[in-house]
């Protein structure tokens, strides 16, 4: 299932991120805030269980907690830009990391790091990456998780295009995809159009715009 999360705050912050003159400081801050706004919708159907607490005046009451582990898995490196925004909403979440970069000539994924928490296979897994372009990196990351036995996986991206969406939906029809914007297309270098440039470079300020 594809879910487009529409909200004026998200749309305004995304517009600022698209602008070439936006500093990496503002870009990073906006991405962090959009991730917080998106995860509210992503977690809407997560199940809870009763949790007993004692209030400051000594009264016992029953509230709620998630019924299983929540795990955030950013695809390095750009996915790190969404991690803190989600952790702000779910501070108890575990964090894993999957390192994948795209070969600039073949556009194929190159794996270089994989480490995730030791959690039950029915845990709530959120794979995060700002860009869903060809979908190859996200597909590779999801493949690794599925091969380990995880099934409750959601993919959260800021912007994406149909090509990447189609690849994930074809290979992983049970993985829900959440986007803030579905953009028009990819250019000859597989950059999203209109997009927002290279998300990793703009998050970390590693290349002049």
UniProtKB/Swiss-Prot annotation:
Cofactor: Mg(2+)
Residues passing through the membrane, by range: none
CDD domains in the record: PRTases_typeI
Domain of life: Bacteria
Classification via Pfam families: UPRTase
E.C. number(s) listed in UniProt: 2.4.2.9
Residues that coordinate or bind 5-phospho-alpha-D-ribose 1-diphosphate: 77, 102, 129-137, 198
Pathways involved: Pyrimidine metabolism; UMP biosynthesis via salvage pathway; UMP from uracil: step 1/1
Catalytic reactions of this protein: UMP + diphosphate = 5-phospho-alpha-D-ribose 1-diphosphate + uracil
Regulation: Allosterically activated by GTP.
Cofactor note: Binds 1 Mg(2+) ion per subunit. The magnesium is bound as Mg-PRPP.
Record: residues binding uracil: 192, 197-199
UniProt entry keywords in alphabetical sequence: Allosteric enzyme, Glycosyltransferase, GTP-binding, Magnesium, Nucleotide-binding, Transferase
Protein's GO biological process: UMP salvage; uracil salvage
Coiled coil: none
Name of the protein: Uracil phosphoribosyltransferase
Source species of the chain: Metamycoplasma arthritidis (strain 158L3-1)
Gene name of the encoded protein: upp
